[in-house]
Amino acid sequence: MSALLRSSLRFKHMSAVNRLTQQLRLLTASAPLSAANTAGKAPFKVAVVGSGNWGTTVAKIVAENCTAHPELFEPEVRVWVREEKVNGKNLTDIFNAEHENVRYLPKIKLPHNLIAEPDLLKAVEGANIIVFNLPHQFLAGVCKQLKGHVNPKARAISCLKGLDVTPQGVYLLSDVIENETGLHCGVLSGANLATEIALEKYSETTVAYNRPKDFFGEGDVTNDVLKALFHRPYFHVRCVQDVAGVSIGGALKNVVALCAGFVEGKNWGDNAKAAIMRRGMLEMINFSKRFFPETDINTLTVESAGVADLITSCAGGRNFKVGRAFGKESGSGKTIQDVEKELLNGQSAQGVITCNEVHELLKNKNMQKDFPLFESTWGIIHGELKIDDLPEILYHAN
């Protein structure tokens, strides 16, 4: 890369941060000194809820940027860690003493300003940016605990990949957070294999955030603030406004990745996997049009949160690995849950949960025939179909 291009890219990112810094200086100079300003504190305090493989990776990024931008962020970042024992010791004690999440992100050193906190309410105390990053089956319980205990002017970002499906319909997880806690919520999603990012290998992500109705002007969270919070030299951020599109891409690609894993496990080759990915993208777009018509289809076909996430998830993500192992064990009597336990060190493949939820939604709406790949994936998981049935089913798809 030429020196001129490096300079241009650096300027593009830094201009947003510099613009923020200048705005905050003007705000501080023109407004009466608040207690925070008098104490010399930065305007944003950040907390992370969730400390699995991906949660810890994002917390690492956030902590690095809180150190890099002291004019914007308070240096200490608390991450909520569900307490458990590791070799007889509390995980949080090991985390804070060794600066490593030995359970879910071993051998990755974490910033010293990242503090593990087992008490959820203490972890988010005083925070005005809260990053949610935990398995989505635990989200409702966490939101109930937080309700009434967070600053109503705080903002949230969801890094979860899934949907909330009820008999009444389907909802974005960012909407669940907003409805349950009152926090205006955006999303972060993309072609983001956690281990690669933790090792600081180059990747991209997409952040979707819309200005809240109660936006209070200078000092509130904006896309520039979020870019400063998440962008790293190895983790490049693109900001868009399509919260629905980014959310759907992150959720449904997990179902497609399971199915791609099935055919990989059967050794059908790359052509077969590409066919699954193509059909999967079509059904992701169809799903978006049916249930979230506000989605910008370009998000799925252009952004990291769409096609790029689908590609990487079907090449090496945990859902793909679970699907591949299940495909190899086809006919052995092992369930998908057995495979999860063997492969994921106590964590879950979100695609299995999402697949079940999408099936229930399509069944309730009498739309099963319109989504043959999603439905076939569900049927294979539950033993109602064989992987060998896939080519014939997809051949007759619209």
Swiss-Prot record:
Residues that bind substrate: K161, R318, N319
Main localisation: cytoplasm
Reaction catalysis annotation: sn-glycerol 3-phosphate + NAD(+) = dihydroxyacetone phosphate + NADH + H(+)
GO terms (BP aspect): carbohydrate metabolic process; glycerol-3-phosphate catabolic process; glycerol-3-phosphate metabolic process
Single GO molecular function: NAD binding
The EC number(s) this enzyme carries: 1.1.1.8
Keyword Zinc: no
Keywords, alphabetical: Cytoplasm, NAD, Oxidoreductase
Coiled coil, from the record: none
Catalytic-site annotation from UniProt: K253 (proton acceptor)
Protein name as annotated: Glycerol-3-phosphate dehydrogenase [NAD(+)] 1
Organism: Yarrowia lipolytica (strain CLIB 122 / E 150) (Yeast)
